[in-house]
């Protein structure tokens, strides 16, 4: 199981400095929030492009926006590896998935806790990964919800093995074992990484804990 730091949880005062702190981490997760789908605003396309140009890591983008499809071309030009959009914001999911793949990126669907797993079943074969929120992405406490574990189990049982399952939201060290056992391939971690004095060291400790990170799926291996 791979541990992927979320740059949105780092200090935003000097992103270059924050990227330097995790320069040896091979994967970074970028949340793009537009202030409409969620009340919070994170990164614009210019900032994403600059981060992609500066970092040597493989970057995936999680679009928490009301119109995910409009970002695809700019993200592709920035060298992003993978993009997912929320089912709640996609009136035509196949159009989104097709455009992401046509742009040369891995395509994903994201689900909030309230969205049934069954909503993605008819799109199997059209997406490369599924991101399951494990907290409410409301910008408040973002506490891990234990009910998400059963959702991960159900998704893993229903979805082909080649589809990567992401778990994202409120996950700390105490939840890692449970999330791994439920069947997640990748875990997005924010405060658990960036709240440490040395984020890279914290990432490495969690990546190697009980073998996490060993024989894990990665986008370059799909």
Residue ranges: model-predicted function:
Residues 15, 31, 75, 130, ...:
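Conserved, mostly hydrophobic/aromatic
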Residues 2-7, 28-30, 59-63, 83-85, ...:
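Hydrophobic faces of well-ordered beta-strands that scaffold small-molecule active sites
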Residues 100, 180, 194-222:
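C-terminal helical cap(s) of enzyme catalytic domains, especially alpha/beta-barrels
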Residues 17-20, 67-77, 114-125, 171-187:
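Catalytic cores of alpha/beta
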